Amino acid sequence: MGQINRKFSEKQFLLFVVNYIAGFGFIATAISLFRLGPFSWLIFLLVSLVSLIVTLSFARLSSIDSQNYGGPYLWAKKAVDKEKIAGRMFSFFTGWNNFIIGPLSAATAPLFILNSFSGIDGIRGNLVNTWILIAIGFSFYVLLAFISTKGTSLNKKLIALFASVKWIVILSALIVAIYVIARDGNGYSQNNNLESGFFGRREISFAQIATVFITFFYSYAGVEDISVMTPDVKTNNFRKILIVSFIAVFLFYFIGIIILNGLQNIAQRGGEANSIGNVADIFKKAAGLGTLIFYGVGALFNNVSTRLSTIIANSRKILPLAYDNYLPSFFYKQNKKGEFQNAIWFTFGTTLIAMTLLVFIPLVASNFDFDNATEYAASVGSAATLLQYIFVFFIIFKFIYKKEPLYQKKWVKTTEELLFCLGTIVIVLMLLVYLFPVIDGFSKWETKHTLTIVLYGVLSLIGLVLFLLQEYKHKNKQNANKQTTQTTV
């Protein structure tokens, strides 16, 4: 192997990680917390705790192989027995699930932007104008996805520019929220009182808690992508970077939640003048159309930068699977320009199908409730991400069982083992109730629950079929070689 070109210093990568994780995921899902009233703090702290546990697991596993790309898929290959089909299948699905997180998260960005503009007078409540907005927004994102298949890249100055716009908009949202609180009075008492106000009359089910947990977890997602970049960092302590970045993100979110919790009528849907169902409503409430457009354009401007590279980046996740013969070699064939065009078009196709279903079906089923549809889209991608974390917990338990030298101090090992067990239990419980909400005995089965299971099931089935076809080809090749050897002898 040639010498690795490490692109980031420790400080640069720390800033990169914080910028990568913290952002529009937070403002897209933060309002969902307050649908639980005073329990919003409990869920915020629980999500943060599980995110910390996940960060600790990735930080621990990052020492397994800091010289090669791959992240969870690379760790899975080292943890299981490749000679057994169960081991190969686990390795494959660890990599495949990491790939399908992309398509399952594809609808969040367009719905988030559509939601930002849906509050403009003349759109909300007008079916024709609503469909025009949806058509324009959806077509725009399809175009961005198509452009990204051409290998469009952004230089460091443009990335810094887009990041600056993102933080200007996010910090503006918090500043505007403080202004609205100062002008209209704070809602801390209203939002945190179990016996009075909006929440005193609400019945909160376990399914609602699980849905909010998974939706808000979207704001912490990203460590699974960061973990594959260990060879790019000039550091001997990748673990410290991940933990410090988590602390920075947590503190920012904590301050943001404190501010948003002071808004009156937060997490109230319906489009009334005094209701706040999303962050765009805060801007609209502050100064009307002008600030709303500022927010929408700023959010769109930042979003374009990420979408221009999303197809290319996600297509890279299936290349190791193809190189290891878990997927057809068709995927890693390059064109004359050196691009993996087949993998890119496959990623584009799966992304387009998932995005179409996750945009239109939730909107129509909810009677064009953009807040609900956006939070649902975020929860679908987040659920797939949480499943990936279960795979990672299994991998680290496997390494511990094999007595790999992951720990130097026994008390650290014992503490982290207990935390990993806790994280696994919480995630499994939340996923079960989210996917099958009727478990709690109060919630009803809805169209979106069927869509979640069917879409994830179909994408997983596609992977399983491709995997089994490769297994069949490999077995036939082995038998043919065996027969040739016997004939020669």
Swiss-Prot record:
* GO annotation, cellular component aspect: plasma membrane
Recorded protein name is Uncharacterized protein MG225
Q: Which stretches are annotated as coiled coil?
A: none
What molecular functions are annotated in GO for this chain?
Answer: transmembrane transporter activity
Question: Which keywords does UniProt give here?
Answer: Cell membrane, Membrane, Transmembrane, Transmembrane helix
**Tagged with keyword Membrane:** yes
UniProt topology in membrane:
Multi-pass membrane protein
Please tell me whether the keyword Transmembrane is annotated for this protein. Answer: yes
Major place of localization?
membrane
Transmembrane regions listed in the UniProt entry: 14-34, 36-56, 100-120, 127-147, 158-178, 203-223, 241-261, 286-306, 344-364, 380-400, 419-439, 449-469
**What is the similarity comment for this entry?**
To M.genitalium MG226.
Cite the InterPro entries for this sequence. AA/rel_permease1, APC_superfamily
Taxonomic superkingdom: Bacteria
Subcellular localization is given as:
Cell membrane
